[in-house]
């Protein structure tokens, strides 16, 4: 019986979508996979979508929110899923090792240990937020997970939800959890309804490094420049070998699963610690990206103010 549905959210990154789906076929072959595409208009991506061997869902109209139709599609996936678990995944991600019965047993044990648990993170940890993670989590005795430190009050939980996570479908529905626009709003809702999201100590998924990024469905200038200098080497990571997975599972849980310590990029020239947007490479591009963001956010604030004033 299929226990897991993987909802892959896609927009204009055809090569990455292919790469993501190939990793699912290799490493999570028994999962039900559905692609939710936000009406990609890139010809190369459209060609990938036309050749899909898994179900494709697209909206009837283009979403105008900052994140496009991501949250609308996440809500639709949650409404339509018929399996025990739902993995929210994005097209710029990879399943980096074989997922087996031991993993499903670990996941079930994590949920069984806490009836208030609605989400589990299957992701390797980002080195850039190590301090925040150490402040909020500790190794969970008897579970293949890191859980919230007991002294952390619910109001101070910072990882109740993430756009990429593994959801316990029945618990979300029983609690009346619905995906709304904005990760912060979803996290606030999750904080009210559930305990903080545990992190798997033997995760199996991660973000590809230095990926093309969109804002309001458009490539920023910094991203366009980054694309011109993009190295042609591999998009993601080498799959972990069986021996590496065995050592990974057997390690002391005091050694946290930070991606840089366990994953080997196909392109050895990617920046470390890993960055996940292509304009986060050279300093000049990072500065340009920051200026673009400030101009964009300032423009939104001005439009909201003018709307309130009726001018």
Kindly give the residue locations of the regions a language model identified.
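N-proximal low-complexity "stem/linker" segments adjacent to membrane-targeting elements
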Residues: 1-22
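Short, acidic, metal-binding catalytic loop of nucleotide-sugar glycosyltransferases
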Residues: 22-31
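Active-site-proximal specificity loops/subdomain of glycosyltransferases
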Residues: 41-82
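Conserved nucleotide-sugar donor-binding
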Residues: 82-83, 159-176
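Short aromatic/hydrophobic "clamp" motif used to bind/position activated sugar donors
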Residues: 86
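Conserved donor-nucleotide/metal-binding helix-loop-beta segment in metal-dependent transferases, i.e.
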Residues: 98-119
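Short beta-strand-to-loop element that shapes/binds the nucleotide-sugar donor at the catalytic cleft/hinge
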Residues: 115-134
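C-terminal catalytic/acceptor-binding lobe
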Residues: 174-311
């Amino acid at each position: 019986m299929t226990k897991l549905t993987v909802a892959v959210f896609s927009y204009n990154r055809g090569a990455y979508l292919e790469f993501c789906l190939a990793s699912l076929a290799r490493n999570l072959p028994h999962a039900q996979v559905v692609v939710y595409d936000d009406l990609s208009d890139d010809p190369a991506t459209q060609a990938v979508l036309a050749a899909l061997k898994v179900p494709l869902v697209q909206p009837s109209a283009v979403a105008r929110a900052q994140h496009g139709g991501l949250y609308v599609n996440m809500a639709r996936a949650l409404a339509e899923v018929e399996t025990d678990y739902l993995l929210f995944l994005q097209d710029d991600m990879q399943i980096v090792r074989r997922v087996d019965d031991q993993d499903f047993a670990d996941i079930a044990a994590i949920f069984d240990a806490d009836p208030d648990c609605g989400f589990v993170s299957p992701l390797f940890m980002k080195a850039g937020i190590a301090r925040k993670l150490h402040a909020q989590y500790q190794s969970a005795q008897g579970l293949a997970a890191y859980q919230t430190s007991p002294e952390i009050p619910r109001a101070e939980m910072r990882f109740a939800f993430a756009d990429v996570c593994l959801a316990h479908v029945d618990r979300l529905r029983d609690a009346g959890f619905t995906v709304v626009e904005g990760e912060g709003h979803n996290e606030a809702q999750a904080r009210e309804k559930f305990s903080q999201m545990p992190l798997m100590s033997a995760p199996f998924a991660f973000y590809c490094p230095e990926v093309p990024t969109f804002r309001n469905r458009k490539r920023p200038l910094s991203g366009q420049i980054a694309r011109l200098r993009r190295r042609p080497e591999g998009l993601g990571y080498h799959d972990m070998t069986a021996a590496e997975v065995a050592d990974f599972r057997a390690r002391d849980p005091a050694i946290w699963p930070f991606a840089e310590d366990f994953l080997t990029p196909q392109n050895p020239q990617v920046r470390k610690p890993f960055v996940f947007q292509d304009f986060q490479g050279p300093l000049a591009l990072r500065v340009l990206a920051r200026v673009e963001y400030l101009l964009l956010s300032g423009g939104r604030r001005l439009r909201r103010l003018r709307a309130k004033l009726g001018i």
